[in-house]
């Protein structure tokens, strides 16, 4: 990959900005060109989302758009932000497992407990294997540094909650995608302002933004082109948003890492939560309503915020 950097350096343009532009353009194009093939195969094999009582659509729609999103992110991040896979060695493996789980759920609908077990494995792989964890709450609720065991458990639970919370907001066309673009834009700008050590995370953010915009072109199109991201796409975005949130908080932890600059910000957890506030509030809202009605918090209904706004 160093040869790619050397090649890009031959162009009279700052290499970081060139990577940002190329990652956005290529991720958009890969998604944009991949989805028509996925739509064609989905229709031929009848791999479609059936309309139901809670559905916002009235006919069968292909729901494997998340496959194109994964492919685009994996290719572009591996080329333009390869440092992430050196630093977080289990990140790609986690995404591949999540892809498998998402596709299985989109095609045959997995049992909830099986999907939960898979999510725990994926989260544990990244948290323990790559040490991506919440180390401190910066004084929120009077809690500062967490011991290793508590940090691991809390981080895994956070991954599971946020991945599923993000999945829940994918109920109407464009919502999960547009919200993802907003969140990754905010994180990307924040990482850019926090110095060169975080530039790979900026490139990851622009890669995801390009990918999602390429998907939204079809998701918001007419019937012949429409496709959903499915659980594959929503879990992928939720997982990567949680990953970038924890990495954002980790910037403000004092640690000895070559090239890293220490910044002091006690409100880091609050800022990360604020960026992801919609899925968090929506999940709390539906759980409270279901418990108040003496129903299981896992029951499906139309009490989500986006359903109320329709």
What are these regions (language model features)?
Residues 57, 107-116:
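Aspartate-rich (DDxxD/NDxxD/DxxxD) Mg2+/diphosphate-binding motifs
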Residues 106-111, 137-146:
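Membrane interface segments of multi-pass transport proteins and intramembrane proteases
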Residues 50-63, 226:
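Juxtamembrane helix-capping/reentrant segments at transmembrane boundaries
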Residues 2-41, 46, 70-100, 175-310:
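Alpha-helical transmembrane segments
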Residues 56-62, 141-153, 262-272:
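Short aromatic-rich membrane-water interface segments that cap or initiate transmembrane helices
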Residues 61-78, 124-130:
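A generic, lipid-embedded transmembrane alpha helix
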């Amino acid at each position: 990959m160093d040869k790619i950097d050397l090649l890009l350096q031959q162009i009279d343009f700052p290499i970081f900005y060139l990577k940002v532009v190329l990652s956005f353009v290529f991720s958009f194009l890969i998604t944009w060109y991949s989805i028509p093939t996925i739509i064609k195969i989905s229709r031929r094999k009848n791999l479609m989302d059936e309309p139901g009582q809670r559905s916002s659509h009235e006919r069968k729609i292909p729901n494997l758009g998340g496959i194109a999103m994964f492919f685009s992110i994996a290719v572009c991040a591996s080329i333009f932000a390869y440092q992430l896979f050196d630093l977080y060695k289990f990140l790609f493996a986690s995404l591949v497992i999540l892809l498998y789980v998402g596709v299985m759920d989109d095609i045959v609908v997995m049992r909830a407990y099986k999907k939960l077990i898979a999510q725990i494995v994926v989260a544990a792989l990244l948290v323990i294997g790559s040490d991506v964890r919440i180390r401190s709450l910066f004084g929120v609720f009077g809690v500062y540094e967490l011991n290793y065991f508590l940090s691991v458990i809390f981080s895994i639970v956070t991954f599971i909650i946020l991945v599923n919370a993000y999945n829940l907001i994918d109920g109407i066309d464009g919502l999960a995608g547009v919200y993802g673009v907003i969140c990754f834009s905010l994180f990307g700008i924040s990482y850019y302002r926090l110095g060169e050590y975080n530039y790979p995370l900026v490139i990851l953010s622009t890669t995801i933004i390009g990918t999602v915009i390429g998907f939204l072109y079809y998701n918001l199109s007419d019937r012949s082109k429409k496709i959903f991201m499915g659980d594959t796409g929503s879990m992928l975005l939720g997982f990567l948003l949680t990953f970038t949130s924890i990495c954002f908080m980790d910037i403000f932890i004092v640690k000895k890492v070559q090239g890293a600059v220490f910044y002091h910000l006690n409100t880091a957890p609050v800022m990360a939560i604020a960026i992801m506030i919609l899925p968090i509030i929506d999940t709390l809202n539906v759980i409270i309503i279901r418990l108040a009605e003496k129903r299981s918090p896992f029951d499906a209904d139309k009490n989500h915020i986006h359903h109320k706004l329709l």
